[in-house]
């Protein structure tokens, strides 16, 4: 992700904090964890007034939907019952919490989180290299020697090309000599791991979606809508309050238990498609993230399909 895109994403997070505070404080006590939002505020200050207004509109659009799904946000049990709004550190994602914004009521030991995205739908950008064991990192099953025997010579060559300062666009054989064999080795390795360990499908989705349930919030500027999507895999979302029930019901979604198919996308040498049971499917597109050749690549991982009981609502901007 470019520095510009990163700043836009952080600015959108800041706009959501502002809008949430404004809407919540009309009903009950709320504070912001100021230290947690320093980076987001810094990014906010780099945006134009037009951009700031756009982020605020995008943030405002989904809040009524959030409140209808989560009555515990507005419920108040006395003056000591205070909502805290905070932004997670980037390092939290490394430990499995993919939520960006967290809404907490410490008095009742309750919190929910939002994963914020601005104009993109990637589930994750995961790096591959000659030393990164994606199997161990993603689903706890180390990659086999047959995988390493294919990919290590490729990344060794890329390291040599980097030392010669070769640009990716000058590497005319990269699809056949780099992308295709790495994706092919990836496909064979995951299929091999699944044969040995049937829990791979659920572990993979847990790696991509984290250890806590959350709502994904995507601002789509061109359409002027904010997509609100539930990932209620453990039943942590949609809790009723003491006196108020949720008016928007969020069902629990089932994790996958089977790999139906893992293969190359038709007519592609750089993208794998994974089809699982219970409605899950994903694409893995390998790409370079730099101008000069380097001995690592990234997978742009996106959901092609999710279970029908993952609720998606398009919230129009005012």
Locate the predicted segments by residue.
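Short, positively charged
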Residues: 1-98, 104-111, 115-318
């Amino acid at each position: 992700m470019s520095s510009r895109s990163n700043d836009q994403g952080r600015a959108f997070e800041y706009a959501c904090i502002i809008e949430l505070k404004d809407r919540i404080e009309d009903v009950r006590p709320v504070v912001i964890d100021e230290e947690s939002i320093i980076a987001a505020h810094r990014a906010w200050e780099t945006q134009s007034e037009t951009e700031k207004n756009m982020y605020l509109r995008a943030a405002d659009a989904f809040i009524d939907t959030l409140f209808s799904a989560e009555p515990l946000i507005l419920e108040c049990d006395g003056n000591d019952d205070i909502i805290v709004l905070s932004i997670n550190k980037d390092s939290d994602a490394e430990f499995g919490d993919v939520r960006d914004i967290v809404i907490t009521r410490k008095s009742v030991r309750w919190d929910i989180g939002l994963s914020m995205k601005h104009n993109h739908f990637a589930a994750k950008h995961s790096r591959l290299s000659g030393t990164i064991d994606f199997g161990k990192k993603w689903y706890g099953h180390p990659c086999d020697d047959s995988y390493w025997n294919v990919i290590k010579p490729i990344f060794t060559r890329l390291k040599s090309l980097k030392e010669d300062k070769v640009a990716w666009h000058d590497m005319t054989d990269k699809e056949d000599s780099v992308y295709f064999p790495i994706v092919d080795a990836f496909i064979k390795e995951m299929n091999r791991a699944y044969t040995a360990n049937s829990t791979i499908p659920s572990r993979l989705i847990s790696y991509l979606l984290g250890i806590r349930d959350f709502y994904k919030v995507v601002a789509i500027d061109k359409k002027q809508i904010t997509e609100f999507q539930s990932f209620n895999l453990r039943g942590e979302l949609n809790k009723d309050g003491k006196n108020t029930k949720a008016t928007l019901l969020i069902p629990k979604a089932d994790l996958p238990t089977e790999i139906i198919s893992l293969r190359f996308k038709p007519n592609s040498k750089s993208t794998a498609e994974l089809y699982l049971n219970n409605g899950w499917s994903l694409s893995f597109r390998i790409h370079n993230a730099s101008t000069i050749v380097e001995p690592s690549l990234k997978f742009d991982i996106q959901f092609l399909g999710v279970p029908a009981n993952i609720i998606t609502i398009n919230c129009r901007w005012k």
